[in-house]
A protein has these predicted regions:
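Small-residue (G/A/S/T)-rich helix-start motifs and N-terminal tracts that mark the onset
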Residues: 1-77
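Conserved beta-alpha-beta core of the PfkB/ribokinase-like small-molecule kinase fold
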Residues: 80, 85-132
Length: 132
């Protein structure tokens, strides 16, 4: 990874169909010659038909993943995707400030391509207050 000039950390959910989420982010980074690291916020069971199940990761493991990557590998930028709820949004905001991240790309994933909700309704304002 040291031969990569740019490193990007994606903080997002996993899409088992690989059409979105961390899987799509990492494929995009690789295609652009950028080293991609990831923090998993949620695991989804989804395919081209829709989302069958969503499990939000515990905040402690999200916190640990962020610290693990940023304290060692580092990141030229952080991209967020599916953050799922207000608590995760607040945690990610806190960690971005704590690690003094200068380049932030916010993709407020709210709904899947098939129309399934991927963000709790009350969390929309958390994006505005805490992350954007």
């Amino acid at each position: 990874m040291e031969h990569f000039k740019n490193k990007v950390l994606t903080i997002a959910g996993s899409d088992s169909g690989a059409g979105a989420g961390i899987q799509a982010d990492l494929k995009t980074f690789a295609a652009l010659g950028v080293y991609g690291a990831s923090v998993l916020t949620a695991v989804t069971a989804q395919n081209s038909i829709g989302v069958q199940d969503v499990r939000i990761m515990d905040e402690d493991i999200i916190n640990s993943q962020i610290d693990s990557v940023l304290s060692d590998i580092g990141a030229s930028a952080v991209k967020t995707g599916m953050l799922a709820n207000s608590n995760v949004i607040k945690l990610v905001s806190k960690k971005i400030k704590e690690h003094k991240i200068q380049n932030l790309i916010v993709d407020p994933v709210m709904v899947s391509e098939s129309g399934d909700a991927l963000l709790e309704e009350e969390a929309v304002m958390s994006y505005v207050r805490d992350l954007i």
